[in-house]
Amino acid sequence: MQQLNPSEISEIIKGRIEKLDVSSQARNEGTVVSVSDGIVRIHGLADVMYGEMIEFPGSVFGMALNLEQDSVGAVVLGDYTSLAEGMSAKCTGRILEVPVGKELLGRVVDALGNPIDGKGPLNNTETDAVEKVAPGVIWRKSVDQPVQTGYKSVDAMIPVGRGQRELIIGDRQIGKTAMAVDAIINQKNSGIFCVYVAVGQKQSTIANVVRKLEEAGALANTIVVAASASESAALQFLAPYAGCTMGEFFRDRGEDALIVYDDLSKQAVAYRQISLLLRRPPGREAYPGDVFYLHSRLLERASRVSEEYVEKFTNGAVTGKTGSLTALPIIETQAGDVSAFVPTNVISITDGQIFLESAMFNAGIRPAVNAGVSVSRVGGAAQTKIIKKLSGGIRTALAQYRELAAFAQFASDLDEATRKQLEHGQRVTELMKQKQYAPMSIADMALSLYAAERGFLTDVEVAKVGSFEQALIAYFNRDHAELMAKINVKGDFNDEIDAGMKAGIEKFKATQTW
C-alpha cells in the first residue's frame, strides 16, 4: 500500500489553488426577511448608508430608510409584488439619482425620471442626486427681481420674487392648481424654466394640466413630474425632491426656474404612511416627528444664489449671472383650518402665503384671494416699479371695504364718505376678478390699477367694471400700442406714462363703448 506524503498533498492543493481563476469581489449582501405594503426588512446587511439604493433580484430597487441593530427597513421603488422572503438584497453604494437637463423640458416623467408621456426615451445622460444640501447663507442673494404670475390680485398685493417660497393655501376645489398653472403659463416668454410636480393627483387631472400647458404653448419650457394617486407612497414622497433637483439644474447654471409642488399635504400623508409601516413612533395627527424636516429641507433648496456660487459651480463656465429657484408649494386645508399641523409647518417655512377662501370663491370672486390674511414677506423689494406705484391703495381699499361691509349690514343710514368707500371697495373687488388661463401682461395690469387708483371707475356701474376693463385694455393695445410696449419692456412709471394713461382713459370714457 502506497503511503501518502502530507507535503506532497499540500503541494498539489497549493498548485490547484494558484491555477484557480476566480475574480475576487467584495459583496455586501443580506436576506429579505419580510415584504409587506412596499416595505422590505433585510437581515445581514452591514455598512448600509441612510438613503442608499438596495438592489433586489429582477432589477428591483429599494431605498434604505431604517437602520436598526439587526435589520434594515427599506422602501421599494416601484412594484414589490415580485419580491419574496429569502431573496437576496445587495448594497449598491449609490444614492438615488434622477435625470436632469434641458432635454426634460416639454416631457412628463415619473418620480424616478422615467418618461411616461409616450414620446420616447430621454436623450440625456446627466443625472443628479435627489437629496441635496441647500445653498449656505454666504452663497445666497436677496430677492429683488419679480416673478410675474399674471394675476392682478397677486402681483399687486402679494408680489412674488425670484428665489422666494410663496405658499398657496386653501380648501379643495378652490383654484389653487389653477393659480399655479396660470403662473407657469405666464412664464412662457419670460425666460423662466418651470417644473410642475403633481403628488397624489388623479391621472385625469394631471393629463388636463399637461393639455392646458400644451394649448397655451408653455409646455415647451416646463418639466412635469407626476406621482399620481395610483403610485406607491414611496414615489409620492420622492417626487417633490426629484422635481427640485431638476429645477436646481437651471438655478446652479445662472438661469431662473419656478417649481410648483401640487401638493405637499399629500406628500406628508405619503410620508406618514411610510413611517407608520416602518414602525416609527407617531406624533401629532399620527405624523412622524421629522415631518417638519421633510418640508424644510425641500423648501430651503429654493433660493437665489450669487454670481460667485454660479461661477464656482460651473468651474468658471458661467460668470456674472445669478441663479434662482422660486417655489410655489400648495397646501390643502380641511374646512379652512390653517392651524393644523402641516399647514402651520409650511407657513412657518415659507416667505409668505396666498390664502384662498371658500366663501369668496362661492360668491364668485375668483381668484378667491383673501388680501387681509395673505402676505408676501420678501416680494415687495422685487415688485415691478409701475405695479408697486399704482397698487399702494388697492390692499387698503379692499381691507377697509371688508370691514365696512360687515358693519354696513347692521347700520341703516350711512354717511356720504362711508358710502363712497363701500362703492369704491365694490369696484376694486370687481376689478380683481380674473378668468382662468388668462394671465395679464404688466401693461394691462398697470392700466387696470391706474383706472382704480385715479378714480376713473367712480362713475362706472359695479356690474360693468369687468367689461369696462376689457374694453379699456383692448382700446389701449390698439390705439396706444407704443405706450403699452414701453411699459412692458421697462416697467417704470414716470410723468410721460402718467400723462399718456390719463389722456387715453379720458378719451376712451368719452366714447362710452363698454
UniProtKB/Swiss-Prot annotation:
User: Which Pfam families is this protein grouped with?
Assistant: ATP-synt_ab (PF00006), ATP-synt_ab_C (PF00306), ATP-synt_ab_N (PF02874)
Q: What high-level taxonomic lineage is stated for the organism? A: Bacteria, Pseudomonadati, Pseudomonadota, Gammaproteobacteria, Pseudomonadales
Localization annotation: Cell inner membrane
Question: Mind telling me which residue stretches traverse the membrane in this protein?
Answer: none
Q: Does the keyword Phosphoprotein apply?
A: no
The protein in question is named ATP synthase subunit alpha
EC number per UniProt? 7.1.2.2
What are the binding positions for ATP in this chain? G170, D171, R172, Q173, I174, G175, K176, T177
Keyword ATP-binding annotated: yes
Q: What is its main location?
A: membrane
Q: What is one term from the GO cellular component aspect held by the record?
A: plasma membrane
What keywords were assigned to this record? ATP synthesis, ATP-binding, Cell inner membrane, Cell membrane, CF(1), Hydrogen ion transport, Ion transport, Membrane, Nucleotide-binding, Translocase, Transport
PROSITE patterns from the UniProt entry: ATPASE_ALPHA_BETA
Which domain of life does the protein's organism represent? Bacteria
State how it assembles: F-type ATPases have 2 components, CF(1) - the catalytic core - and CF(0) - the membrane proton channel. CF(1) has five subunits: alpha(3), beta(3), gamma(1), delta(1), epsilon(1). CF(0) has three main subunits: a(1), b(2) and c(9-12). The alpha and beta chains form an alternating ring which encloses part of the gamma chain. CF(1) is attached to CF(0) by a central stalk formed by the gamma and epsilon chains, while a peripheral stalk is formed by the delta and b chains.
What is the membrane topology noted in the UniProt record heading this document?
Answer: Peripheral membrane protein
Q: Reaction(s) catalyzed by this protein?
A: ATP + H2O + 4 H(+)(in) = ADP + phosphate + 5 H(+)(out)
Chain positions of site Required for activity: S374
Q: Give the top-level enzyme category.
A: translocase
Q: Which HAMAP family match?
A: ATP_synth_alpha_bact
**InterPro entries per the record?**
ATP_synth_asu-like_sf, ATP_synth_asu_C, ATP_synth_asu_C_sf, ATP_synth_F1_a_nt-bd_dom, ATP_synth_F1_asu, ATPase_a/bsu_AS, ATPase_F1/V1/A1_a/bsu_N, ATPase_F1/V1/A1_a/bsu_N_sf
The entry assigns this protein to a family as follows: Belongs to the ATPase alpha/beta chains family.
